[in-house]
Amino acid sequence: MGKVAALLLMAAIALAGCSRSGPPPISSGERYVAGQMTDMVYHLGAGDKIRVLVYNEPQLGGDFSVGADGEMSLPLIGNVPVAGKTIKQVSRDVQARLADGYLRDPRVSMEVQTYRPFFILGEVRAAGQYPYLSGLTAMNAIATAQGYTPRAARRTVRIRRFGDQYEQEYVLTPDLRILPGDTIRLTERFF
């Protein structure tokens, strides 16, 4: 009887080791699906490239990059903090700074030219940093990284959203959106 109890105990321990830890994966239908991107507010960050147009002042406009310090250096007014702000907020800030002793009634227009890159690591053939393209999904990102390795888990993906401290596991579906600055990690599957 002692051998049977010991065998059952060992089997229970072995099965407990196979159990999943942590919360279940989030269905991509719950967050960041393709149709919702237009409703989301994009916050600028390091690596973004912004096109600035100042009406009747072409020498003040151009394409400017957001530096690692979260600032963008513009002619005449110098460094402007932009990290964490929307394009509208930055446009208003620049307009106010230009109106403060430089131009009378300045009109400023801005748009994001190039978004910060996304990163993909783990069980893909070519892990690395890639340029973000509007409408990017997790499946597109995996294809950009030359597809899965033979050991890759193909049902879920882990994503750390830009600005978040932790990654979250998502069910891999065709509409799972990737955002600028996201880090995607494909894990190894268990046999």
Model-derived features with residue positions:
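Ser/Thr/Pro/Gly-biased, low-complexity, turn-/loop-rich segments
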Residues: C18-F191
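Sec-dependent bacterial lipoprotein signal peptides
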Residues: M1-A16
